[in-house]
């Protein structure tokens, strides 16, 4: 008996949430167009596009090959000569931004002035 009551309740709730078939396609399209016009007006002020283009920039300092750095005692907790710096910087895009990246990437392992 309980299962029949649950079944009738489920069928009744499904019938209550059934979409009405009285709407015409033109009314649905008009409603969608009106919503598209009103949506930018209702957007919160915090959702506006930011004018500055800042991104996290990662700089890796690798001095494991030896340099005249600090002379304190080594702690033994990881790589002593390796440091990572993360900083928010403004990214300026221009015509040569892609070419500059390719130049840095391709020259990474090349010897400069006879020093590797």
From Swiss-Prot:
Major localization listed first in the record, in broad terms: plastid
Keyword Translocase: no
Organism, as annotated: Hemiselmis andersenii (Cryptophyte alga)
UniProt PTM: Contains three phycoerythrobilin chromophores with binding mediated by both the alpha and beta subunits.
Alphabetized UniProt keyword annotations: Bile pigment, Chloroplast, Chromophore, Electron transport, Membrane, Photosynthesis, Plastid, Thylakoid, Transport
Residues the entry annotates as binding (2R,3E)-phycoerythrobilin 2: 63, 67, 85
SUPFAM superfamilies referenced in this protein's UniProt entry, alphabetically: Non-globular alpha+beta subunits of globular proteins (SSF56568)
Other facts noted in the record for this chain: The light-harvesting system in Cryptophytes contains phycobiliprotein complexes. Unusually they are composed of either phycoerythrin (CPE) or phycocyanin (CPC) but never allophycocyanin (APC), with only one type of biliprotein being present in any one species. Unlike cyanobacteria or red algae these proteins are not arranged into higher-order phycobilisome complexes, and they are found in the thylakoid lumen.
GO biological process, one term: photosynthesis
GO cellular component: chloroplast thylakoid membrane; phycobilisome
Record: residues binding (2R,3E)-phycoerythrobilin 1: 53
UniProt record similarity statement: Belongs to the phycoerythrin family.
Function: Light-harvesting photosynthetic tetrapyrrole chromophore-protein from the phycobiliprotein complex.
Subunit relationships: Heterotetramer of 2 different alpha chains and 2 identical beta chains which form 2 alpha-beta heterodimers within the heterotetramer. The two alpha-beta heterodimers are rotated to an open configuration in contrast to the closed configuration found in other cryptophyte species due to the insertion of a single amino acid, Asp-65, in a conserved region of the alpha chain. In the open form, the central chromophores are not in physical contact but are separated by a water-filled channel.
Binding site for (2R,3E)-phycoerythrobilin 3: 64
Superkingdom per UniProt: Eukaryota
Subcellular location: Plastid, Chloroplast thylakoid membrane
Name of the protein described by the UniProt record: Phycoerythrin alpha-3 subunit
Membrane topology: Peripheral membrane protein
């Amino acid at each position: 008996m309980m299962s029949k009551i649950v079944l009738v309740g489920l069928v009744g709730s499904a019938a209550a949430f059934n979409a009405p078939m009285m709407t015409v396609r033109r009314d649905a399209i008009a409603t969608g167009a009106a919503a598209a016009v009103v949506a930018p007006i209702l957007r919160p002020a915090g959702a506006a596009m930011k004018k500055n283009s800042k991104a996290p920039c990662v700089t890796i300092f690798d001095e494991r090959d030896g340099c005249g750095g600090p002379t304190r005692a080594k702690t033994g907790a990881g790589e002593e000569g390796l440091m990572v710096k993360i900083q928010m910087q403004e990214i300026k895009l221009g015509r040569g931004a892609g070419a500059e990246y390719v130049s840095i990437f391709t020259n990474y392992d090349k010897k400069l002035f006879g020093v590797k």
